[in-house]
Amino acid sequence: MLAARIAGPGAGRDNGRVHVAVIGAGVTGLVAARELLRKGHEVEVLERWPDVAGQASAFDLGNGVHLDRYYHHLFESDRHMIDLHEELLPGQLEWFRSSVGMYARGRIWPFTTPRDLLSYSPLPLVDRLRLGIAVTRLTRRNDWERMDDIPAAEWLRRECGARAYDGVWLPLLLGKFGDDAQNVPLAWLWSKLTLRRKLEGRSAGRELLGYPRGSFRAICVALADDIRAQGGRIQVDREVLAIERDQDRWRLRVAGPGAYRAPAGTGPADPDLTRAVDAVVITAPTDAARDLAPWPDAFRMRLAEWTYRTAVVLLLELRRQYSGTYWVNVGESDVPFLGLVEHTNLVPAERYPARYLYVSNYVAADDPLTQLSTDALLAHYVRQLGVIAPDFREADVMRAWSFREAAAQPVPKLGNRARILPFATPLPRIYLANTTQIYPEDRGTNYSVRLGQQVAQAVGQTPA
């Protein structure tokens, strides 16, 4: 057992209870903390931001109505998150019929069902058929490991044809991955099309998406409440600056309140907040984890292999409906954003004070869009928003917010399986769990739940 291998104050207690610090109060960190408490460990969670939930965070629109900063939903195959809701928030997860569209040639085309594909006239019929056959063949495969070295772009161009590739896939790949689009493995696309969107039971032949009452933050608040009820501690507005050796334990240097307002890692450490622990679970992104601990050079280089795309999201509060579609992919390369998600076309608008539209983009970390103010971002997008929906007027915008997440999308590359890091790091009793480790699956709250469960299981199973 882990405790038997740990020396120093507070370790090796009679019942195997050890002091574990979890860095990050997003879904993965909270689930890991809860599971570790169930194993009988002493657990505290340290979060840089002044609230729990991480990338599942929300904000108050007024009168206690919360809305996600970044759009989320669940598929019926997302059993980890569904089961968690059934346990902690029974009856709060609801299912709604979805609609997907593709913007091309000046209009939004339905793009939800096979029938929609057959009616998608921006492509000649032969290309529609070819695209449908290729996707069907791909989703019936179960050998994703063999796809790890195959470029998705190359396969799509060959199997779907140049017109379907240029008109459907290329804008999506470029919008998602930019300069890395040509090196994204086919395994990633296979997972996107097969695992996350597997339809079960009542959703066969249509698409139902799940959304919890009160936003996705609600499940994080429920997790936090359960952690505290079990005796765990959650410290928000506490940024961990460094993990240092302290004989056979680990000492965490922690910044004081307000450090989140400064760039990560730059706040001064507060000596009163320094603490020694037996084990550490890091749920921060890989680029942030790279500078946290005294890693061996070879491991630090493996951490440095990972890059992320930054999410830039403009959220608009509208007087009236923008379009009749929940999720609109953009199939035109000259449009300055990747997609549109009209939340109130999924969840009934009556639950909110207005209509809400997310304008989504994924960009490189140094892209100028990451530096634009909310007003400047709206000004950059507003003309194209009117082109896509001709009835839209800038006067329809009542309020606007913008959000940026630097570690929104890990970038998979050819041969990505070899880049996946185990939960146990080379440093004894330090563990890593983040979205770079869920490949071939794409990032999502469901896989964050699974990650938290898996890393908690790994704690204590590896030699010190």
Task: Mark where each language-model region is.
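Extreme N-terminal leader/targeting segments of oxidoreductases
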Residues: 1-20, 38-39
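N-terminal Rossmann-like FAD-binding beta1-loop-alpha1 element of flavoenzymes
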Residues: 18-45
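Glycine-rich FAD pyrophosphate-binding loop
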Residues: 37-62
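Mid-domain catalytic core of redox enzymes
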Residues: 39, 238-371, 375-392, 403, ...
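Dinucleotide-binding Rossmann-like beta1-alpha1 core, especially the glycine-rich loop
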Residues: 63-144
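Active-site/ligand-binding neighborhood in enzyme catalytic cores
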Residues: 131-242, 246-249, 258, 276
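Short FAD-binding loop at a beta-strand-to-alpha-helix junction that anchors the flavin cofactor
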Residues: 357-358, 423-441, 447, 451
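Internal hydrophobic alpha-helix adjacent to the cofactor/substrate pocket in enzyme cavities
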Residues: 449-464
